[in-house]
Amino acid sequence: VIVAGEPDMLKALQGKVAGVDIRSSQGGPGSATKINIRGASSFFGDNEPLIIVDGVPLSNQQITTSNQTSGGSNYSGGLSSIDPNDIASMSVLKGSAAAAMYGSRASNGVVIIKTKSGSTTSGEKRFGVTLNSSLSFENIANLPEYQNTYGPGFAFKYSNSNGSWGPRFDSMEKIPAWEDYLNAFPELFPEDGMIPYEAVPNNVKDLFQTGHIYDNSVNLSGGNEKSAFNATLSHMKHEGYIPNSGYKRVAMSVGGSTKLGNGINLRGNISYTNTDQKGGMYGENQVSGAASSFARTLFLGRNWDLTKYPYETPDGKPVSTLTSQYDNPLWSWKHNVTTTEADRIIGSIGLDYDVTDWFNISYTIGTNVYSMYRKEVIDIGSRAAEGKGQLTDHKARTVETESTLLLTFEKDFFEDYSVKAILGHNANERKRTETLVVGTEFKVPNIYNLANTKNQVVSGDYYEKRRLMGVFFDLTLGYKSWAFLGFTARNDWSSTLPKNHRSYFYPAVTGSFVFSDAFNLQSNMFNFGKIRVGWAKVGRDADPYYLYNVYALGDPFRGQTITSASSSAGNNNLKPEFTEEVEVGTQLDFFNRRLSLDFTWYNKISTNLIAPVQLPNSSGFVEIYDNFGKIRNRGIEIGLRAVPVEIKDFKWEVGVNFTKNKNEVLELKEGVERIALAGVLTDLA
């Protein structure tokens, strides 16, 4: 991850693991990155894998303030705050069989991250200092292929409008200057307010700049026979290719472990990250009164040279070629701005006790605290907010605490047989608070706080709490280190499900056979061969507050608080979702492991899905969440790795991944023909 020089640890995984789909929501600095493994298995539930950092779960949720219709910015995600410089290792568990060990939240797979501060081990006396520094540049990757023969207008007649349906550029010499520019800066147009009618081939490209990323870190590590420590400090600054966009991250972490004697080992680590993100409005904005710097940017009139002329008057008012349809992007990037400051603290402490050489007791408790403060400004003069200005003040805080107790038995019998059994208990609690206040119509220009707005409305004030408890058992039987059979079972209890369905059980069975060892097939050409099979069933709970009819507090009326019922009816008979998956695969290594092939076929079916069903108006509600539907994901994954060159101090490794996943909705509820997952003018599901 460090070698990749990518400030987002998920983006560094792009193309590295077959079956893992990684996509960025926006191209701006710090923008959220979504990860999906083997397709979507739920209509409305979270389809991202569980992220575990040093034993502590971490949500990759993207907290949005405005949607893509009204504006929308390049909001960051949960993993944007993870410092790649502190990552020691990262592994991806793709199959549902992993869920029995990690709980129902792992139904979409697991990404396990071990940091340097969280993976210290004692050993020989040592002390080390590692410095990393990188500088990289970025430019906008692609733009449409523009024509430069025809200008703006309709039916080959000139008019100041978007598109290129007007006359040829070689058919006219001059046209009237744009009204906004002529009124604001008449001195720029001395020839009777006329300008040349000519194409500007790079008028879109010239709006952008060359971005750069500075990333510096220092790592200290040391230890002796009994203790070890590790500490990392890093600073990253990303200036984007969109003007006035950027992302800063300062991260520090420290961890260590020590042997207390009598088989007891104490370990712990803590990390703190502060991020500061800034960017414009980048949303859809094809509706009236919305704010987006990209409303018309990608299909400007071919003669609109926005970088040649000022984009604002001396008092800050916008100037553009067609004010009624779009904000000048250069003005918008300066004035319509979203700034987000966030802090994340992840800490864990654990105790390991080797009772005997074959029995170990381990307990880990950790917490993850995330706090965010965001200001979203639509400045005076924008076509949005009626031109009067708007400020959205958004605060959010999430606290997640998890504890895990493991009893591990591991012993060999009669030289050829091995047994490993894990009995565990897991407890998880998540709390979230969120407030969102919108102030409209600035009293005084250039002062961006709620006290400077004439009207304030609390558009959101949320509190959410949920708990998930589980017990699990994992048994692995081995024979001669080439045949393995595994059994896993877990039972969870979720606070988001009704009492009669709160408890749900799910098992898994896996097997693997290393035939190259069993039949002694190793040679210079063929080194390793393994076949693996697995079946798993995993349950998943609902989001909070689907069970009962709940009420919300509205705006006061004549001093009295107004309470209104939710548009969703409660359903006290909700059941968990279930996913069954069958997986078959093989791993083959050739030519002293310089060529390897990994192939997997899987078939995953999800049932009992939790989704809304429309209700008749006479019910007094709009919808109710219920269990219905069936989704199938079926596909193959191929990973090919080769080492063309390997000498003493040099190794060149190349890899190719291929994934094919077919995602099908097999069933809906009787009488339900379609479910709207997203619309043209709404966020993508």
Q: Can you say where each PLM-predicted feature lies in the sequence?
A:
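Immediate N-terminus of the mature polypeptide
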Residues: 279-281, 287-290, 340
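Proline-centered flexible-loop/turn and helix-kink motifs
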Residues: 13, 18, 186, 296, ...
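N-terminal, polar/charged subdomain of small-to-medium soluble alpha/beta proteins
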Residues: 384-385
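Extracellular/periplasmic, surface-exposed regions of secreted and cell-surface proteins
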Residues: 3, 48, 249, 255-260, ...
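Short, small/polar-rich motifs associated with maturation and membrane association
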Residues: 1-253, 258-267, 273, 346-347, ...
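Flexible glycine-rich, low-complexity coil/linker segments exposed to the extracellular/periplasmic environment
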Residues: 146-203, 296-331, 447-458, 462, ...
